[in-house]
Amino acid sequence: MEKNTAPFVVDTAPTTPPDKLVAPSIEEVNSNPNELRALRGQGRYFGVSDDDKDAIKEAAPKCNNCSQRGHLKKDCPHIICSYCGATDDHYSRHCPKAIQCSKCDEVGHYRSQCPHKWKKVQCTLCKSKKHSKERCPSIWRAYILVDDNEKAKPKVLPFHTIYCYNCGGKGHFGDDCKEKRSSRVPNEDGSAFTGSNLSVELKQEYYRHMNRNSDENEDYQFSESIYDEDPLPRPSHKRHSQNDHSHSGRNKRRASNFHPPPYQKSNVIQPTIRGETLSLNNNISKNSRYQNTKVNVSSISENMYGSRYNPSTYVDNNSISNSSNYRNYNSYQPYRSGTLGKRR
């Protein structure tokens, strides 16, 4: 009888043939990475030597653009269209299938190149004639529902909140700008920033405002050719001497176009001596005016005694009597040096 070997299990696996290489053990592994690569070789996971013809070698890198091996995507020499898959024909942004006409909804051309010139398109949402309902930009703008009561209210277009993306001006959209377009991309199909996307009521108000502003700007336009000509010669003015009083300020005021001041009018009373005025009777002659005036000469001379306007500090009775020769107002007449004229 055979002995029962349970619970022991007999290993029936075949032994490793001596002609195959075995992966290095932990004792054979060195800390030097170069020796480890040389020890493992090409088939380091399966213990295959580099000289073995039947060994499974690693594949070359695969390109993510054309799916070919031997190069990476950054070095790929082929042009692959991501829309139609054409190779070495055109770029993705130039693919005919990616270009869709906003007028006939066909692919391969823009609105300006549409062969259906007679076809009319109108959006049922914003009443625009430049795109269909499926391409309306107001679809992703409708965040709040509007009641019927709010629709009945008259709409007012806030021009102070409308700015142009082309010139930065206020009061119009970028597609309707009259200035030269700053972007090199042609605006053939239009965008959402145009007056055509407004409702019927606001559209009329918008274009009426645009026409009014264009008329006002035309009034301020001028030709710059007038500045190219030589300036006109200026008239030469002769120099006048200091004693020539023909061009004094008084004569200039008389020759001006303004109205004369009130004291130059004939019907206004003109004073002759400080502190006294004439009567309202204009028939009195000038000689009678000066004869009828009464001036206390002695009082004037007494008041001038000791003041800076007195010609001398010495008081003489004869000088007081002859004080009528002095003017009854400021008699100060300095010399060239600016000092007072004192008699010694």
UniProtKB/Swiss-Prot annotation:
Belongs to the AIR1 family. Residues 317-337 have a biased composition (Low complexity). This is Protein AIR2. GO terms for biological process: nuclear mRNA surveillance of mRNA 3'-end processing; nuclear polyadenylation-dependent CUT catabolic process; nuclear polyadenylation-dependent rRNA catabolic process; nuclear polyadenylation-dependent snoRNA catabolic process; nuclear polyadenylation-dependent snRNA catabolic process; polyadenylation-dependent RNA catabolic process; RNA fragment catabolic process; TRAMP-dependent tRNA surveillance pathway. The lineage of its organism: Eukaryota, Fungi, Dikarya, Ascomycota, Saccharomycotina. Present with 1800 molecules/cell in log phase SD medium. The modification Phosphoserine is found at S31, S49. Component of the TRAMP complex (also called TRF4 complex) composed of at least HUL4, MTR4, PAP2/TRF4 and either AIR1 or AIR2. Interacts with HMT1 and NPL3. The interaction with NPL3 requires the presence of HMT1. Interacts directly with PAP2. The keyword Ribonucleoprotein does not apply. Pfam families: AIR2-like_ZnK4, zf-CCHC.
